[in-house]
């Protein structure tokens, strides 16, 4: 909101400087973005009158003018196209100083003496008009200093308002704030009701009362829109960053800036029948005032006549019904449109207007009649004309209402940290226009006026007290809390530590949506019934995920498409399994891996990551809480995973996750041209383990035996290792599979497994007989249980 300081001070004028006023507004939550002077720095410029003009004898585009300053006549050479006898203009006399340190001196132009300069608005930095002289009113007092006449010792102040403070999008609203801040009376202009001098009306029918609870219209006949807008109004509009167009538009803009109520003037001759406030028909066409043709949607509120739409309600009028210089009769509109009906409509059509800006933030629903009378009075004063009666349609049941709010002094003290005297609380709230009634000692009932639609709770009133009292006066108290240390189970690993573990292994954390495309749901969980949203953000975010894999794989695609060849990502979040009546929301930890095993470097190769690399990462996660031995990896089946590279992860017989390569068919469908590995774990299972136990380091030597075993190809390495552990005795300290071989020299139905076993006794040296006996027991058990024999 941009406004003229002098305009504001015409309503309320505390005895403070501009700088202090600006600082106080900012401290009260009305942040001032900029302060711009109304004109440049100049002196020696007065109101002049052109008495006569003659053609320059030696220049086609120059005129020799006789100009009066009220006491003397001066010869001035001027090239402005609009210079003419009788015109009153800014006259810079000899010795004047214009913006940019430009001093006016006596000069000769093409041999003709010139004693001064006739000025445009741009030359005084008092506007943008640079195509001709600045034309002053016919009654401008000749000889008066132009700064005083145009009140140019002024500034435009721009305030950046938060969306909840739509009540301050007017001079009246800002004046209320300033009056409350400085405990100064606000002087409103006297707005008298305009009596009707004819009885012509246009019937008004509101077919969408919820969207338009109040609509006022008035016929004003015989206006003369060729009359210029008064300079004082043009200047106030300019300093509010609004361009002057014609008298009717300028007046509606002026009243909107002054009171905060948007208005619109229609050309009465272009209205067929009466006014209908209705929802648009789907695809209905309307050419707007800016020349843009829009195809209206059915959710758009329009002002229409009996044949066609005339305007988008609260946004912009139509071109064919807009007023022009030839308009003689107008229909003036002043209405209250519900915020919901206007919100977002301007943006959806690529528009943003002063009217939509206000309606989206809220307009006082009691203001429409006062604004109508104000605009009517100004129209009759400036353009002439005859006013008819006001037609008003009101749906009381759809008008907003604000319930009284109870305020407690104890709550004020609790939230602000200081005691404000009861009398001061009442004074501050009353200054805002709130009706305060004492209910008990330290408790009030506050009636909120219609212009403060942002106040509905006790905390809103306390916020107002803090603003008016002064945020800088509130005591500084640092928060205090008695924090007891929280016990942490030693056998439990928390999520932040798991995140750090995966980051240390080269992963990056991803955060994806819980909503996925139903098509992706079917790809990763074929046959399962998705949990669909009733009101999805978009069609491709309509299902709740049953796995974290779709989001991670989509993120992988995004990275691969941007030449990121080595991708390792993990995510923690909820998966949603089942339907509403039995919905299970389960925290999961998942990852996706693709690309080379190691980052590019001179000392390592470019081998691609494989199943066992990812399995090592998963084992690091499973072993984080000290319970790796409780988990087993068994061949598994999953519709999204490769049938030969899938591991089902179990703990005590419970399924806790899956690990594997993306199924080749799924990879082809998703356009993945390289192996992609994924894992997913139930977070609760991998976060709990066993208490660590201390084992004293033995001072005695280790004994190692390496065994090369032959086993059937369908026997898993883990089954072999389990049998070895069962028979290796209590002094086994390490068991490691270090080679697997299938091929030449081996039965095609068999495979070779090389394992290393290490024993160490805590209190003595083991001898070969003991180790050999244990080794024999291991081999015997392997042969009996798994048909695994020692390779010879």
Swiss-Prot record:
Cofactors required: Mg(2+)
One GO CC term, this protein: phenylalanine-tRNA ligase complex
Instruction: Output the SMART domains linked to this UniProt entry.
Output: B3_4, B5, FDX-ACB
What sequence ranges are listed for the domain FDX-ACB?
A: 698-791
The record's section on CDD domains has: PheRS_beta_core, tRNA_bind_bactPheRS
Look up keyword Iron and say if it applies: no
InterPro entries (alphabetical) = aa-tRNA-synth_II/BPL/LPL, B3/B4_tRNA-bd, DNA-bd_dom_put_sf, Fdx_antiC-bd, Fdx_antiC-bd_sf, NA-bd_OB-fold, Phe-tRNA-ligase_IIc_bsu, Phe-tRNA-ligase_IIc_bsu_bact
Enzyme Commission code: 6.1.1.20
Catalytic activity, as annotated = tRNA(Phe) + L-phenylalanine + ATP = L-phenylalanyl-tRNA(Phe) + AMP + diphosphate + H(+)
Give the residues the record marks as binding Mg(2+).
454, 460, 463-464
Q: Which PROSITE patterns match?
A: B5, FDX_ACB, TRBD
Q: Name one GO molecular function term.
A: ATP binding
Q: Does the keyword Aminoacyl-tRNA synthetase apply?
A: yes
Cofactor stoichiometry and binding remark? Binds 2 magnesium ions per tetramer.
BP-aspect Gene Ontology terms: phenylalanyl-tRNA aminoacylation
Q: Which residues form the B5 domain?
A: 400-476
Q: What is its main location?
A: cytoplasm
Assembly and partners are described as: Tetramer of two alpha and two beta subunits.
- So what family is this one in? Belongs to the phenylalanyl-tRNA synthetase beta subunit family. Type 1 subfamily.
Q: What is this protein called?
A: Phenylalanine--tRNA ligase beta subunit
State the organism of origin: Pseudomonas savastanoi pv. phaseolicola (strain 1448A / Race 6) (Pseudomonas syringae pv. phaseolicola (strain 1448A / Race 6))
